[in-house]
């Protein structure tokens, strides 16, 4: 059996794969307190809401059968995306509709799609990258690019606080967004350090991205 480049890349050992395998093995060996890996805590109040909703689905005629047996819109369940748009508009003052929302099978799938939409070879022959304006970043991003050299990053400015604490910031003096950059990506809070970009930093990034678009 001969694999394509895609097949070799996605069947190879990856950082996020090792991390999730380690977490899975740890959970299988007994009670553990999950502090990362996407499972930070079981919150009884939230689980109670989910349980109540699941019970309501099971009791409603045809609802369970529809979920397990009917295809939804590729964008996501229409009723759910409409409800989610209303929630965002009501709670955050946004002005979006269902057409602005797409559902995926988790964040890895979402970022795989986004990264490869904006990075790689374009129709004009130009190769563009995803820029992380702050590093270190989430290990799970590393293997999501279909092409080599999908990502580039900028070293941070480090602010030393009272020992032993420090905080790192975007080095805007060195940040350049030219035609080789397809998109910016930041985690807030940053994984794995928990560093949070300030509102001012986010606004500056947004302005720079608009200028470069």
Please name every model-derived segment:
Residues 66-212:
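Conserved core of the PLP fold type I
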Residues 1-76, 86, 90, 179-180:
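N-terminal "arm"/small-domain region of PLP-dependent enzymes with the aminotransferase-like
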């Amino acid at each position: 059996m001969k694999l394509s480049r895609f097949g070799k890349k996605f069947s190879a050992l990856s950082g996020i794969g090792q991390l999730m395998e380690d977490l899975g093995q740890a959970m299988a060996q007994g009670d553990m307190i999950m502090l990362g890996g996407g499972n930070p805590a079981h919150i009884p109040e939230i689980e109670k809401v989910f349980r109540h909703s699941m019970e309501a689905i099971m009791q409603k005629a045809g609802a369970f059968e529809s979920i397990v047996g009917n295809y939804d819109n590729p964008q996501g369940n229409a009723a759910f995306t409409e409800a989610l748009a209303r929630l965002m508009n009501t709670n955050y003052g946004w002005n979006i509709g269902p057409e602005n929302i797409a559902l995926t099978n988790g964040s890895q799938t979402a970022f795989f799609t986004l990264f490869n939409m904006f990075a790689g070879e374009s129709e004009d022959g130009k190769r563009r990258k995803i820029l992380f304006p702050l590093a270190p970043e989430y290990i799970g991003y590393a293997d999501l690019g279909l092409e080599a050299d999908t990502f580039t990053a900028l070293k941070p400015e480090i602010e030393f606080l009272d020992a032993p604490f420090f905080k790192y910031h975007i080095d805007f003096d060195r940040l350049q967004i030219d035609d080789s950059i397809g998109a910016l990506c930041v985690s807030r809070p940053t994984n794995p350090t928990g560093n949070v970009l300030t509102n001012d930093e986010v606004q500056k990034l947004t302005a720079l991205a608009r200028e470069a678009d």
